[in-house]
A protein has these predicted regions:
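Active-site-proximal beta-alpha core segment in soluble small-molecule metabolic enzymes
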Residues: 47-199
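Active-site loop ensemble at the mouth of alpha/beta enzyme cores that anchors a bound cofactor
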Residues: 207, 243-335
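A generic structural signal for residues embedded in beta-strands
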Residues: 365-366
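Conserved, mostly hydrophobic/aromatic
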Residues: 30, 52, 83, 153, ...
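Short, basic/aromatic beta-hairpin or loop at an interaction surface
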Residues: 334-348
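Active-site loop/helix belt of alpha/beta enzymes
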Residues: 141, 150, 156-275
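Generic N-terminal amphipathic, Lys/Arg-enriched alpha-helix
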Residues: 5-25
C-alpha cells in the first residue's frame, strides 16, 4: 500500500473532522474480498457470516445483502440480543457453547421484548453443544420452561479445542436428542482453524485438510447410522473459517461455510490461503506528539547511546490511545517502542526520520 493511499485517507479524515482513534473500512477492498467469498459459495455452499469479526450492524447488513445470506454466527450474549433486535430475520448459530445460564438470560430477555417477537428462537436460533453434560443442562432448562431448542453439536475434527471427539459419545448425544420432547438436532459444526498453521514436517495444509475431512465424514456416517440416511438432508453441516474457506471446492461433505475476518483481513489472519485477499480494515490513531531524539527518563547520555544502538528510535511519536491488537503499517517501518512498554492512553511508536508525517496526522495499523 502506497504513501498516496494513506495520505488520501488522512485527508479524508481531516475533511470529516475526525480527531479520535477511528476504525476505517475500505469498502472497495471489502467488496473485492466479498467477491472472493462468493466465488467459493457458488460451488454449492451456504454462507454463515461470523459476526464477531464485523461487530457493526450496518456492516453486517451490507455483507448480508452482498452475499445473499441470512445466516449469522454469534459468540457473545450481548451481541445476540443486538442481532435479534436489529436483524430479526436472521438465522443465528452460536459459535461457541454458552453456559446454560446465558441461554436462560436470553429467554428471560426475549420473553419481555415486544419488538423482537418476530424472531422465533425455536426456528431461528441454534445452540452449540459440546458435551453430554451441557446437553443435559439445556434439556433441563427447556423442560422447565417448555421450550423447543435447536441443537447443533460441536464435533472435534482435529483442532482438539473441545466438542465430541469420538463417535460413541456423539451417538449417545444423538440418542438423547431423539428421545427428548424439547430438543431438535439442527446441525453439526466442525471448526478446523489449525489447518493453515500445520507445519510441513507434519504434512502441512494438504495433510491437515484431508485429516479433518476424514474425521467429519466419520461423524456424518455415525449420524446416518443412528438416525437414517435422510437425517442430513435438512441439517446445517457447518465448517470452515476465514483462513480455510478457500480450501473447499465442492459440497459433497458439508453444506455451509463460515467466515468473517477474511472480509477485512486483520494482520493475524494472514495466510497463504488468503494471498488474493486485501487488507480492508485499519485503525487510524492521531499523532499527539512528534518527538525528535526521544529520551528515557533521567538518562540523556544513556538515551543517546540507546538511539545509536537502535534500542530507542531516532524519531518517535505518541499517539492518541494505543495497546491495540494490531500492527503499524503506515508510515512504513513504523514500530512500537518496546522500551516504553504498552499504553492505552498515549502509546509510543518509532517512525522514520525522513517521514513527512506531523502532529495531528494519523498513523495506521492493521
Amino acid at each position: 500500500m502506497s504513501d498516496a493511499y494513506f495520505k488520501g485517507i488522512t485527508a479524508a479524515l481531516h475533511t470529516a473532522g475526525v480527531c479520535t482513534p477511528t476504525l476505517i473500512i475500505d469498502r472497495a477492498r471489502l467488496d473485492r474480498n466479498i467477491d472472493h467469498v462468493i466465488d467459493v459459495l457458488n460451488k454449492g455452499f451456504e454462507y454463515r457470516l461470523v459476526t464477531k469479526s464485523l461487530p457493526s450492524i450496518p456492516l453486517l447488513q451490507y455483507v448480508m445483502r452482498r452475499t445473499g445470506t441470512q445466516r449469522l454466527m454469534c459468540f457473545h450474549l450481548p451481541f445476540l440480543l443486538q442481532l435479534v433486535n436489529h436483524i430479526p430475520s436472521s438465522d443465528i448459530l452460536m459459535g461457541k457453547p454458552m453456559p446454560v445460564r446465558a441461554a436462560q438470560e436470553f429467554y428471560d430477555w426475549h420473553s419481555g421484548q415486544t419488538s423482537s417477537m418476530c424472531f422465533a428462537p425455536e426456528l431461528q436460533l441454534q445452540w452449540l453443544i459440546d458435551s453430554m453434560e451441557r446437553l443435559e443442562q439445556y434439556e433441563k432448562l427447556a423442560s422447565q420452561r417448555n421450550l423447543r431448542l435447536r441443537i447443533c453439536l460441536e464435533i472435534d475434527v482435529g483442532l482438539h479445542r473441545g466438542g465430541f471427539r469420538n463417535t460413541a459419545d456423539f451417538t449417545a448425544a444423538l440418542r438423547f436428542i431423539r428421545r427428548s420432547n424439547y430438543l431438535t438436532l439442527s446441525g453439526l459444526m466442525g471448526y478446523e482453524a489449525h489447518i493453515t498453521k500445520m507445519p510441513i514436517i507434519l504434512g502441512g495444509i494438504k495433510s491437515a485438510f484431508a485429516d479433518t475431512q476424514g474425521r467429519y465424514a466419520n461423524f456424518l456416517r455415525a449420524a446416518k447410522a443412528e438416525l437414517g440416511d435422510h437425517i442430513l438432508d435438512n441439517l446445517c453441516i457447518n465448517t470452515g473459517g476465514s483462513t480455510t474457506y478457500t480450501l473447499y471446492h465442492n459440497s459433497k461433505l458439508v453444506n455451509e461455510i463460515a467466515a468473517g475476518a477474511a472480509l477485512v483481513m486483520p494482520s493475524n489472519f494472514s495466510a497463504e490461503t488468503l494471498e488474493h485477499h486485501h487488507k480492508a480494515a485499519f485503525i487510524a490513531a492521531p499523532i499527539l506528539k512528534n518527538i525528535s531524539k526521544p529520551e528515557i527518563p533521567l538518562t540523556p547520555a544513556i538515551s543517546t547511546m540507546l538511539r545509536i544502538l537502535g534500542v530507542l528510535p531516532k524519531r518517535a511519536c505518541f499517539i492518541y490511545g494505543g495497546n491495540w491488537l494490531a500492527d503499524p503499517c503506515y508510515p512504513e517501518d513504523t514500530q512500537h517502542c518496546k522500551i516504553f512498554g504498552r499504553s492505552s492512553n498515549q502509546e509510543m511508536y518509532g517512525i522514520p526520520v525522513d517521514s513527512d508525517i506531523k502532529q495531528d496526522d494519523f498513523i495506521f495499523m492493521t
